[in-house]
Amino acid sequence: MLNKTSPIPLYYQLAELIKEQIRLGEIKPGDQLQSERILSEQHAISRMTARQAIAYLTREGALVARHGLGTFVAEPKLTQDTLHLLGFTEEIMQLGGNAVSRVLEQTIVLPTARVAADLRLDTDDPVVKIVRLRLSDDVPLLLETTFVPARICPGLEHENMAAQSLYALLEQSGGLQLKRARQTLEATIANDYESRLFGVALGMPMILLEGVTCDMHERPVEYFKAIYRGDRFKFAFESERSVWLNDMPGLPRVGIVLA
């Protein structure tokens, strides 16, 4: 029930109510949402308020508008697990999805100063650059750019990276044991290239994940940069507070960096 005496806008209250109905399974992915007219009559609000709530949820990715058909509950967002070191292929398979990669670039290059520093290399040390568009059920979900020191896995530039997990390849063929990744998460928007690649609107909210993966010897073995669709992903974090406010080895940590 909406509280008309609350300072919280009615459209926002209605949007939260609809999200709760989705969360509880009262309305399911693929179900058609009630019309503006029915929602306005049901909650004794104006059609404009109902329209605002629907538009808000559509922008959030909870609803999807289908031209000439109406508004429907969107498929749930994929949860990117940051607590366990999984590649995209492993993550999607764990969720029961079908992971596909389109390799846009796979070659040996010299690293930029930023990549060289993160991988503890000189700028004349060759790295394998792999750029892949990652899809699930034919929907582009993320654009991933990866740099791996060429000496770590000889021949990586010739591997079929459209059909296999990089992490599995590094562990099985490269003999590495991956331990952890240091990552940063940042809100961004789709530029012209990304909007065309993903088939989304220019300026659509996106998520930028950057980081470095290390092996059991704390040696950097991968620098990665991934652009995720903001309407299809959410990220899972877990934090534990230290009573003494000291670092606690082995626990995931979340930090905030002000730009």
Per-region residue spans from a language model:
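Beta-hairpin "wing" of winged helix-turn-helix
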Residues: 26-31, 58-68, 72-74
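Extended, compositionally biased flexible segments
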Residues: 47-48, 58-59, 65, 83-94
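All-alpha effector-binding/dimerization core of bacterial HTH-type transcriptional repressors
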Residues: 75-259
